[in-house]
Amino acid sequence: MATKKTSLTKHPLKILFVSSEVEGFAKTGGLADVAKSLPAALKKMGHDVRIVMPFYQTINGKDNAVAILSTELLVESQPFAVSYQVMQLDEGNVPVYALDAPQYYDRPELYAENNQAYADNGERFTFLSAASLDLCEKLGFQPDVIHCNDWHTGLIPFLLKTRYAESDFFAKSKSVITIHNAVFKGVFNYDQYSLIPELIQRRYINAEMDPSHISMLKAGVAYADKVNAVSPNYASELLTHLGSHGMEADFQNRAKDLYGIINGCDYDDWNPETDVYIKQKFKANKVSLARGKKACRRDLQKQVNLPEVDVPVYGMVCRLTEQKGLHYLIPVLEDFLLNDVQVVIVGTGDPTLASALRDISEQHSDKFAFVETYSNPLAHCVEAGVDFFMMPSEFEPCGLNQMYSLAYGTLPIVRSVGGLKDTVIDYDQTPQVATGFIYDTPTPEALLIKLQRSLLLYCQRPQEFKRLQQNAMACKFNWDESAEQYLDMYLGGEQSLVNEICNDKVDA
């Protein structure tokens, strides 16, 4: 796996950042947060950054969008063209180009309706890859780096090395693909790739699938100049069968070009000193922290109809999926509720998991609240109002909630996977600098042991607990630092992505 080598440039880079979703416009998960925050941080460093995304029917800000290009995507050897417009959206200093192609994006949701993925998702996001490069030529934006994200953009590196291999316009353009979640590989039948007929001859086939299927993610990993994961530990996990979900050979082939960079946290949104959603703002000093947490606990208890008593409160805000480890928590939750504690879980998802949580909440309504919805204000109130935040994840490429928890003096209880391992310091290993609790074994019993350990700390060592809260609030994961590491990846290492670009600019 590649090691980070600091390398700076005084010459601004032109960076095209392509994502299927961007916070503020369209969002289903953490990818959107990265697609907003990382380009903004790179722009702040002086680089010329442009974002490309689809112009969804439900996109926010569409009323203020301005059409800056009306054109067609022409495909050599194909008897058709796809008409589209480039709509510029207002997002501060970073231009956002949204691809308006109604046949692909004029739908009620981004990827699926009623838990059923759109049947033509392969073609929809093949278009995103092809049109992103097409618009660069037509707008005259000649990128030094094209930063791709997950399978939705995985065909851009392929196109650069095939269709545009002899292009003067893209001659010095290099590509990066960031892996936010390798479980989603973008596997579709050949008939969805008519916009990129070159792909069919290359046959980047998922070996576990029918031979008539191609994986966009595999193509992206194979052809990108650099590959990175959203945490150092997740980068290591991608080299294993379990961590890569069967793509270990693909990542092992790119090990020398594989980087791990932790996501930043948006402290403009998640800051107990300024949070508009919580009952009482607070700082890290002991008096402010104690008063603020107590007021926020009382407010949370009111909101979820739990008794307003002084007991440790445990929280969880997540999609109800096995990835988030609910199948480890549910079997031991009732045992844990025998203690003098309260638990709050907020989320929607798997009907079976939701039903199990509803049953437990009905039987233990004085100790357990299950809120089967998602509300951003309530999520803030949970982070501020609970004492411990549970993340018993099956896998977690980076994770954001543990960072939010640390900012609010809420101690995370996490499994030692992905970015959770990179961002939380375990009390049982290094108590002086600890910020939470970590465990390894993916079993309900191992989780219960850590829950009981955290309860002992709270009840028997209150001063130690308060010290850990202050340790947690001192942790910072700033996007500026993450952006510096991304720039180092663009510029650093023996095979710098853009060293020849910088040299050309120096010569000029």
From Swiss-Prot:
It catalyses: [(1->4)-alpha-D-glucosyl](n) + ADP-alpha-D-glucose = [(1->4)-alpha-D-glucosyl](n+1) + ADP + H(+). It holds the Pfam family Glycos_transf_1. ADP-alpha-D-glucose binds at K27. CDD domains: GT5_Glycogen_synthase_DULL1-like. One of its GO terms (molecular function) is alpha-1,4-glucan glucosyltransferase (ADP-glucose donor) activity. It comes from the Bacteria. Its EC number is 2.4.1.21. The keyword Glycosyltransferase applies. Keywords: Glycogen biosynthesis, Glycosyltransferase, Transferase. SUPFAM superfamilies: UDP-Glycosyltransferase/glycogen phosphorylase. InterPro entries: Glyco_trans_1, GS/SS, Starch_synth_cat_dom. Disulfide bonds: none annotated. Pathway: Glycan biosynthesis; glycogen biosynthesis. GO terms for biological process: glycogen biosynthetic process. It is an enzyme of class 2 (transferase). One of its GO terms (cellular component) is cytosol. HAMAP family: Glycogen_synth (MF_00484). Synthesizes alpha-1,4-glucan chains using ADP-glucose. Belongs to the glycosyltransferase 1 family. Bacterial/plant glycogen synthase subfamily. This is Glycogen synthase. It comes from Photobacterium profundum (strain SS9).
